[in-house]
Amino acid sequence: MKAKSLNTFLLLLTGQFILAASLNLASASELYFIDAHSQLDHRVDDPELVIQRMDESNVYRTILAARSKRQPGEIVDMAEYHPQRIVPAVRTKSGAYNTDNPKYYKKMKKQLRDGRYKAMAEILLYHAQKGDKAPEVMVYPDDPRVKFALNVAIEHHWPFVIHIEFASLQGKQRQQFMQKMKNLLAENPNHAIVLNHLGQLRANELAPLLRQYQNLHVLTAHTNPAIITHSNQPWSNMFDGKKLSSEWKDLILQHPNQFVFALDNVWERHWREFYPEQMAYWKSALADLPSEVAHAVAHGNAERLWQLAPR
């Protein structure tokens, strides 16, 4: 009798292990992504390449903005054709913004009157020159152009995405940008401020900011070897081989609700060549995290911040 009971117990225990393993596999297979910030340059001949790449890598949605000579309305049209996949973002970049021309406000207001945008693209605060494609931009966080965009984001309940390349700043300028970013965070404690590219900060530099400012979130764009190896910019590398490095993994585990997956693809090469390899890195990295953390970073935090329905 005892032997029979023991056998029954072992069978039940084995069944539980099999069930648990099956659930874990199901959880891993169901992990999907939301790219919380990308852009589409006019040199991408076929915009459907975006959807193709998303389908290949289980990216459910992309928050997308126009770039270069591509018009913002083209992104809205694309979103209407793919309403569950593309989230159209107000375009913020322009020569008018860079030169403090009043046309910047006119361009923004025209898009806002359209009423179909669901997000706003990043605001460039410090952007180092990138060859002949992207000029240097230096606009402090307390500039009227930035305050205008912030008020738009607050009014529409959109996260405010900022771009500061701290590793490309030196001395007094770096200190000023850091202090003014802290002021921005402190003055808007109830609004999500999202720093693209981790701000080009190291893990030990970002950690105290995440602890102090609960409204600070960071995008993971351009932080993997697939893109870093093709760039001469000092991007933050979150990886050690195919997995997250220990310092970045620990920081994500400490602040799982403040990290948001993003790619920030822009150019043809980003979409056509680099996309599959970038996604391979991120799938490998998130597979090494607890399921609830992986889901938060991959899509949950973006859904919460941008008020997007889960898949």
What are these regions (language model features)?
Residues K4-S5, L25, L31-I34, D45-S68, ...:
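Mid-to-C-terminal alpha-helical segments outside catalytic/metal-binding sites
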Residues F9-N24:
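Bacterial N-terminal signal peptides
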Residues A28-F148, V152:
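Mid-domain alpha/beta scaffold segments of enzyme catalytic cores
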Residues L40-P47, S68, N101, V139-V146, ...:
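Solvent-exposed, acidic/flexible segments
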Residues D41-V44, K69-P72, G95, Y126-Q129, ...:
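Active-site environment of divalent metal-dependent phosphoester hydrolases
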Residues A121-A128, H163, T220-T223, D264:
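Short loop/turn segments at strand-loop or loop-helix junctions that form parts
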